[in-house]
Amino acid sequence: KWMCTGGVNAKNVNNYLGYNQIIAVGGTWMCKSDKIKAGAWDEITAMSREAVDVMLGLELGHIGINCADEAEAAKTAETIANLLSMAVKVGNSSIFVGKKEFEIMKKPGRGTNGHIAILTNNVDRAIYHLGQRGVKFDMDSKNVKDGKTVAIYFADEIAGFAFHLV
């Protein structure tokens, strides 16, 4: 495994981290020497936090809506699709609306109201960094394929929604 430190910046950090051989990146783009000399720790912290946020690439994946049964799911999917002029794709356990922005569950799934999927560039790195921010994970929900974590749920709901990283 390698740690790259030369030529890395906010625009290309994820290109480096996309290689299995690269375990970490670093460099002066995250912590300028003049900031260290000046003791500008708040600025250094902000730059480092920005670097981590860029690396994680967290963004909304989809919203899952729990329905009581298949009939309610079909009606809900049709309503959302008609309202937003989106396509419907029926699956085994759910119905997707749009480009998978909405997942309408055919029976109640995780979360009181449903679930929210958060996309990330690397689930394992996101588990570590979000854990540092106080997020607890349901380790029993961890889904691993080819040695990499591909999904995991937060331990706690937020506003009646289960959250998971994918």
Annotate the PLM regions.
Residues 9-12, 21-44:
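Glycine-rich phosphate-binding active-site loops on the catalytic face of alpha/beta enzymes
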Residues 52-77, 111-118:
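N-terminal beta-strand motif that seeds the catalytic metal site of vicinal oxygen chelate
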Residues 64-103, 125-128, 132, 143-150:
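Core segments of cupin and vicinal oxygen chelate
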